[in-house]
Amino acid sequence: MGDITRFGISIDSDLLDSFDRLITRKGYQNRSEAIRDLIRATIVEEKMDAGHEEMVGTVTMVYNHHVRDLADKLTEHQHQHHHQVISALHVHLDAHNCLEVLVLKGSSAEIKQIADELLGVKGVKHGKLFLTSATPEHH
């Protein structure tokens, strides 16, 4: 971490009370830690919106592996994007359903496109994309 700069802010007391409750609920030691995390999260969102920053993400999906050709389609899709798909975890939830978590790296636009394509495959019950910055921020 670089030099620490102290600064003050003006804030409505009701908003501050809500923020303090959030800090307590999330287990922060102090307001500064919480504010730093909020700033980092906002910077990551800005990078995601830009579309060209390098990001990492996970695509988590649940599907019934008995659906005809579904597992093959998902695997083929991963191979088509082998430069972006850097890891995969496959879990058998029960006799019919599987959970798959893919780790992807690339621009936010690329990752979003791959996730949309995977989650749009017929037979995928549900899924979610989580993106974050691949560039470490100072803590």
UniProtKB/Swiss-Prot annotation:
A GO biological process held by the record: response to nickel cation
Coiled coil location: none
CDD domains attached to this UniProt entry: RHH_NikR_HicB-like (cd22231)
Molecular-function GO terms, alphabetical: DNA binding; DNA-binding transcription factor activity; nickel cation binding
Required cofactor(s): Ni(2+)
Binding site for Ni(2+): H79, H90, H92, C98
Cofactor note: Binds 1 nickel ion per subunit.
Pfam families xrefs: NikR_C, RHH_1
Keywords, sorted A to Z: DNA-binding, Metal-binding, Nickel, Transcription, Transcription regulation
Family, similarity comment: Belongs to the transcriptional regulatory CopG/NikR family.
HAMAP family attached to this UniProt entry: NikR (MF_00476)
Function of the molecule: Transcriptional regulator.
Name of this protein: Putative nickel-responsive regulator
Source species of the chain: Trichlorobacter lovleyi (strain ATCC BAA-1151 / DSM 17278 / SZ)
Lineage, opening ranks: Bacteria, Pseudomonadati, Thermodesulfobacteriota, Desulfuromonadia, Geobacterales
